[in-house]
Design a protein with these regions (language model features):
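Class II aminoacyl-tRNA synthetase catalytic cores and aaRS-like
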Residues: 1-342
Length: 345
């Protein structure tokens, strides 16, 4: 490929046995057994076990390497013995016998967090040293998953006839659900641009211009208080518009997009509802679940028992009913004659 590597580590397998190659990456960890030194080399795709014995002129220098040193290694691919095969790695059937190496960049002696561990270092440390945090296997998996999902969404929308069109980032303020982030203009003193809370007006201009189906993975900026489940300030949303479409057309596209995406990327132990997804009116949702975003994994439903309290003489209920309130209860399953506590709900 180039002077730094001939292959990505994920592409190294038993087909390359006896071949001499060059690879580059980070030292994930090393193990000195006295007569043998094992190095787990890591790149963005996988790990490769490299080995050198104490008869090699490189042994002493390689014994000094540290985790996260960046290194280029030249050597011969050899087959592992049956008992040392690692079936969890693409390269687990082979190892690289080191013949030469070059340290491309040395790591400091102590790291604020260990890249090769799953220890919880706390959000403050992880965000301060984000470039190290993102090297960790879990975070690498997450950012690759995000990339794969975005590419899948783009492919789905293109197959459905949608065009991906960009909208301006520096724009004028428009009323939305939060406050705007403002950017001062260098040219027009005292004037400000607003970052879009959503591409609403511009996408509608696209539709008025004759675009039939529009979508965008759009950055949105909202100056609002942080929440436990949402990063403050900015987020990305799948934004879409359709011309000459009914509500059923839109629900159909969104349902299939969600189903296909989750069906492809969910873990094996998870399951999702088959299409069509159940639909509820706002009124039905409030009456049956008490909210407009119900968790359908919970089988319990609210029951309207208002009529049983009308004229019952229980003033606390009758006064509320006169003001338009409803009395709801939860019917616990198979609870007759048994004590019930909150833990059962």
């Amino acid at each position: 490929m180039n002077v730094y590597r001939d292959y990505y580590l994920k592409d190294i397998n038993k087909e390359l046995v006896d071949k001499k190659i060059t690879v580059s990456g980070w030292i994930n960890r090393s193990r000195n057994h006295g007569n043998l030194l094992f190095i787990d080399l890591r790149d963005s795709t996988s790990l490769l076990q490299c080995v050198v014995d104490n008869s090699s002129v490189n042994f002493n220098e390689l014994s000094k390497i540290k985790n996260e040193d960046v290194i280029k290694i030249y050597g011969q691919i050899t087959k592992r013995s049956e008992e040392t095969i690692n079936s969890n790695l693409e390269s687990g059937e082979v190892e690289l016998k080191i013949e030469n190496f070059e340290i491309l960049s040395q790591c400091s002696k102590t790291l604020p967090l260990e890249v090769n561990s799953d220890n919880d270092y706390g959000e403050e440390v992880r965000l301060k040293y984000r470039y190290l945090d993102l090297r960790r296997s879990k975070m690498q998996h997450n950012i690759k998953l995000r990339n794969n999902i975005i590419n899948f969404v783009r492919g789905f929308m293109n197959n459905e006839g949608f065009m991906e069109l960009a909208t301006p980032i520096l724009t004028a303020p428009s009323p939305e659900g939060a406050r705007d982030y403002l950017v001062p203009s260098r040219i027009h003193k005292g004037s400000f641009y607003a970052l879009p809370q959503a591409p609403q007006q511009f996408k509608q201009l696209y539709m008025a211009s004759g675009v039939d189906k529009y979508f965008q993975i759009a950055p949105c900026f909202r100056d609002e208080d942080s929440r436990a489940d949402r990063s403050p300030g900015e987020f990305y949303q799948i934004d879409m518009e359709m011309s000459f479409a009914t509500q059923e057309d839109i629900l159909d596209v969104i349902s299939r997009l969600l189903f296909d995406t989750f069906d492809k990327f969910k873990s094996k132990e998870k399951s999702i509802n088959k299409l069509p997804f159940p639909t509820f009116t706002y009124r039905d949702s409030i009456e049956n679940f008490g909210c407009d975003k119900p968790d359908l994994r919970n089988p319990l439903r609210l029951k309207n028992v208002t009529r049983y309290f009308e004229g019952s003489g229980l003033q606390i209920f009758e006064n509320l009913i006169k003001k338009g309130a409803m009395v709801n209860c939860i019917q616990a399953v198979k609870s007759e004659g048994k004590p019930l506590s909150l833990i059962h709900i």
